């Protein structure tokens, strides 16, 4: 009888672990690759000074399974701020990717744009942007790289082109705010994850650690080209990756839809 009880216990534990394994596999399957690593299918470029879909200098390209922001065809940056948008808008999701800054900044780039890029969320569409519009109305998860030790330069910060947010239940109109992340000085890959919950709470993670959170994104403030929507809550929008004059690479770009 004692042996039977032991066998039953082992069998039950085995079944539980099997189900846990199935659940883990299911969760992994829920992540959608929105960049296939081969081409830019499903993505559209918008460069300041040009209509949506036109990338005169081939800024965004694919190399070694990474989405690469390159300035090899630029003589001078000339404020050609750009973004590449994924085709669908989203509201509730987790976005994760790896990124790294590489090489030297393009000639003519702003000093503040050295090792500077971003992931835009809750963004307006590329088609709705004006020809001469540097940044989409959006929430920017700002990516920065360290330039020289010991000067700290956090990443996964918050910038708000045409938007405002609440922090600790207070409306914040400051354009850029620093996260609590560490500084990455080299060309190492850094893992970024963003949790977006409609017009409620948004969280930034670096290498698995939460480094910033805020709530209640709305339209308004500096860089707002949607004047008729001032004060509207941002409940959904497009995802885009930024080109601000410093080469950067992105890979493993995946999305998990939340209920």
Model-derived features: positions:
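Bacterial Sec-dependent N-terminal signal peptides
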Residues: 1-26
């Amino acid at each position: 009888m004692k042996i039977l009880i032991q066998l039953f216990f082992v069998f039950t534990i085995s079944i539980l672990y099997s189900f846990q394994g199935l659940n883990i596999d299911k969760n992994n399957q829920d992540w959608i690759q929105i960049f296939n690593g081969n081409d830019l299918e499903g993505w559209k470029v918008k460069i300041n000074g040009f209509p949506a879909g036109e990338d005169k200098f081939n800024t965004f390209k694919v190399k070694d399974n990474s989405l690469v922001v390159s300035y090899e065809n630029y003589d001078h940056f000339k404020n050609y701020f750009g973004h590449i948008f994924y085709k669908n808008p989203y509201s509730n999701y987790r976005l994760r990717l790896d990124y790294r800054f590489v090489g030297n900044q393009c000639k003519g780039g702003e000093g503040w744009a050295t090792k500077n890029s971003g992931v835009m969320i809750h963004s307006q569409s590329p088609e709705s942007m004006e020809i001469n519009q540097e940044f989409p109305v959006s929430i920017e998860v700002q990516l920065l790289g360290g330039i020289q030790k010991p000067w700290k330069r956090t990443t996964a910060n918050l910038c708000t082109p045409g938007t405002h947010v609440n922090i600790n239940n207070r409306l914040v109109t400051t354009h850029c705010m620093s996260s609590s992340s560490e500084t990455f000085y080299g060309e190492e890959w850094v893992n970024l994850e963003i949790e977006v919950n409609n017009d409620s709470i948004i969280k930034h993670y670096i290498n698995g650690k939460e480094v910033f959170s805020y709530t209640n994104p709305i339209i308004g403030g500096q860089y707002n080209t949607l004047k008729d929507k001032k004060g509207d809550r941002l409940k959904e929008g497009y995802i885009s990756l930024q080109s601000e004059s410093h080469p950067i690479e992105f890979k493993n770009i995946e999305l998990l839809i939340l209920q």
